[in-house]
């Protein structure tokens, strides 16, 4: 056998095997793309104009005995965040809160409930700052789906996945929420710190400092990731028997939201008075955003639906043409 014939035979084997390999890759890509599409149909993107979410949060309880404290965590250790837009008259919100309870179970999460405030005759919680936090972050996405920037109930997991109303996309609302919770945060490398240098429980004045490192991770490799730090004040439980949805004790009530200037600094804040009890916590929440990318985002296990088209083109190109077969 001549060397030329050997090379020709080898090339023929490669030509026969390569389409089979491409078909296998095509099937894998199609299957995974379909699975991801089915999963993501359970929710809406919580942000518009680019990728974004919540890296996580740090939480510190501010009791009458608290005078100072510090928390430092790597981004990978930060607690996942579930944000809920609700109202004390919202009957459907009772359904969603029970579903969240069941989906979360014993998982370690920070829940933050935004109560309707603007043009609100009943609900006593929240303020203009909490409304601003919700609308500036999720208002555009909510408007795109519902025509309104504030809809009770709305539930957002990790600042990325928004669920509206009570109609499930799968077998149940609990299943939707469990899937969304298990999808997890977008991972980054870095760390954040919150320090309360002094706190006077009588004047409610808190001196604090914060730091968040510029992240590295899948969303920051090809684009500039922008971080925004927020200081939130959340009451663990607030009793309001006059709420017409009958909950009575409203949990995780957000009383104030402060957008911090930069990723490192010091400040003085007026801690909101608890509605009742002594159970207000300060939360440092880190938002991330990055410009839209041409492809499909970081959640795709392969380079997205476009890979199917690309592999198909390669496959067709490798098939012997009819003209060549007739001439041999």
Q: Where on the chain are the PLM-derived regions?
A:
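Long, contiguous hydrophobic alpha-helical segments, chiefly transmembrane helices and signal peptides
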Residues: 81-85, 96, 152-157, 231
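Conserved segment of the thioredoxin-like fold in thiol-based oxidoreductases
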Residues: 94-152, 158-169
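Secretory targeting signatures
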Residues: 1-49, 80-82, 90, 296-328
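Generic hydrophobic alpha-helical membrane-span motif
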Residues: 94, 190-194, 310
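Short, conserved sequence motifs used for protein processing/export or organelle targeting and
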Residues: 127-148, 154, 170-305
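Short loop/turn segments at secondary-structure transitions that flank enzyme active sites
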Residues: 32, 117, 161, 235-237
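Proline-centered helix-kink/hinge sites
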Residues: 30, 98, 152-153, 303
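Local sequence-structure signature of Cys/Sec-based thiol-disulfide redox active-site neighborhoods
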Residues: 41-121
């Amino acid at each position: 056998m001549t060397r030329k014939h050997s090379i020709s035979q080898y090339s023929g084997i490669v030509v026969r095997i390569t389409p089979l390999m491409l078909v296998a890759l095509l099937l894998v890509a199609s299957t995974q793309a379909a699975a991801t599409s089915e999963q993501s149909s359970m929710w809406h993107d919580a942000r518009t104009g680019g990728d974004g979410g919540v890296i996580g949060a740090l939480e510190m309880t501010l009791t009458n005995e608290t005078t100072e404290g510090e928390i430092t965590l790597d981004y990978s250790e930060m607690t996942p965040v579930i944000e809920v837009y609700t109202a004390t008259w919202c009957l459907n919100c009772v359904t969603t809160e029970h579903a969240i309870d069941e989906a979360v179970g014993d998982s370690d999460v920070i829940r933050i409930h935004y109560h309707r405030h603007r043009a609100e005759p009943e609900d006593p919680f929240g303020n203009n700052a909490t409304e601003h936090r919700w609308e500036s972050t999720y208002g555009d996405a909510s408007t795109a789906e519902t025509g309104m920037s504030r809809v009770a109930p709305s539930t957002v997991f990790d600042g990325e996945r928004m669920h509206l109303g009570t109609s499930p996309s799968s077998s149940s609302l609990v299943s939707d929420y469990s899937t969304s919770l298990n999808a997890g945060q977008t991972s980054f490398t870095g760390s954040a710190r919150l320090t309360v240098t002094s706190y006077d429980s009588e004047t409610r004045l808190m001196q604090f400092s914060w730091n968040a490192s510029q992240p590295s991770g899948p969303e920051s490799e090809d684009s500039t990731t922008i971080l925004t730090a927020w200081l939130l004040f959340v009451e663990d439980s607030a009793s309001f028997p006059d709420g017409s949805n009958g909950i009575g004790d409203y949990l995780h009530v957000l009383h104030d939201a402060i957008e911090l200037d930069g990723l490192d600094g010091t400040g003085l804040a007026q801690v909101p008075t608890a509605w009742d009890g002594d159970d207000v916590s300060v939360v440092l929440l880190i938002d991330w955003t990055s410009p839209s990318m041409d492809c499909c985002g970081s959640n795709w296990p392969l380079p997205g639906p476009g890979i199917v088209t690309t592999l198909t083109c390669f496959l067709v190109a490798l098939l012997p043409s009819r003209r060549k077969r007739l001439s041999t």
